[in-house]
Amino acid sequence: MTDDTADPFVVRWLTWCSQALQSHKYPIRSLVDVSSPLSPDTETREDVIARGRCEQWKEDLLRTSPMVRFMVKHLTLIQCNPLSPREDSASQGTPPKLLIASCPPDIAGGFSPSPPERPTAESGILLCANRIFSKAHLEDTISHEMIHWWDHCRFKVDWGNLRHHACSEIRAASLSGDCNWTREINRRHFALSKQHQNCVKRRGILSVRGNPACKSEEMAMKVVEDVWDSCFHDTRPFDEYEFDSI
């Protein structure tokens, strides 16, 4: 089954189920740690097919997606080219910066920030092929994680600081397409006003709640509210951004 031949209803249903259950998780520690989330011996035939399909979608998006190409350009401008080889790429088993892999149920993937002693360009993104069911879903996911990467490179984010984490989650949810009108309707979230803002807050709280430094949902809600005004209106690297409205 390919992106072009898949039953549109099935693709929409699978994508909705994945998005309803999956928020963009607290950044994973290191791509090296999860470079083979499922070994070839444990991958099913469906996992292998999904991984190959996702690799093709990724290559297509890097060539044709205005959003993905924009983020690649602006990451490169701040010396964080996501497509360049790693400094230690000659080492056997070193994963690419954009890693497509099959993942077990407890790994959702996400942005993997570089350790403090390493250049921010050595960060990366893990994309779990068996959790992504359409090219559009992959496009939004890559865009979301690249906004985290841009923040990490531009602002040297401390991901253990809840205010830093909340700010990047607000920006990523708002700017990536995560909270566009159609996506929210597919998630069964509808509001007569401020639908975009409600989505950004909800998804920001979910992500911050997954941070080990966050002790409760109330704490996550308070942190998101505390940084909301400055972070929601910060649209860098975009000059301006048009939010969906109804």
Curated annotation (Swiss-Prot):
Assigned EC number: 3.4.24.-
Biological process terms in GO annotation: mitochondrial protein processing; mitochondrial proton-transporting ATP synthase complex assembly
InterPro entries linked: Peptidase_M76_ATP23 (IPR019165)
Localization in the cell: Mitochondrion inner membrane
GO molecular function: metal ion binding; metalloendopeptidase activity
Keywords, ordered alphabetically: Hydrolase, Membrane, Metal-binding, Metalloprotease, Mitochondrion, Mitochondrion inner membrane, Protease
Domain of life: Eukaryota
GO CC annotations, alphabetized: mitochondrial inner membrane
Top EC class, one word: hydrolase
Topology in membrane: Peripheral membrane protein
Its biological purpose: Has a dual role in the assembly of mitochondrial ATPase. Acts as a protease that removes N-terminal residues of mitochondrial ATPase CF(0) subunit 6 at the intermembrane space side. Also involved in the correct assembly of the membrane-embedded ATPase CF(0) particle, probably mediating association of subunit 6 with the subunit 9 ring.
Family the UniProt entry places it in: Belongs to the peptidase M76 family.
This protein's name: Mitochondrial inner membrane protease ATP23
Biological classification of the source: Eukaryota, Fungi, Dikarya, Basidiomycota, Ustilaginomycotina
Gene from which the chain derives: ATP23
